[in-house]
Amino acid sequence: RCCPMPGCFAGPFCPCCPV
């Protein structure tokens, strides 16, 4: 699951969001 962040897109890898 990816967390929604400003300037960050929710993708399959979610590089901006910590897992």
From Swiss-Prot:
GO MF annotation, one: toxin activity
Expressed in which tissues? Expressed by the venom duct.
Q: Where in the cell is it found?
A: Secreted
Task: Keyword check for Nucleus, yes or no.
Answer: no
Q: GO CC annotation: what is one?
A: extracellular region
First-listed, main subcellular location of the protein, grouped into a coarse class: secreted
Family, similarity comment: Belongs to the conotoxin M superfamily.
Q: What is known of its domains?
A: The cysteine framework is III (CC-C-C-CC).
**What other remark does the UniProt record contain for this protein?**
The precursor sequence of reg3l described in Franco et al., 2017 corresponds to the precursor of conotoxin reg12l (AC A0A2I6EDL5).
Please identify the protein, giving its name as recorded: Conotoxin reg3l
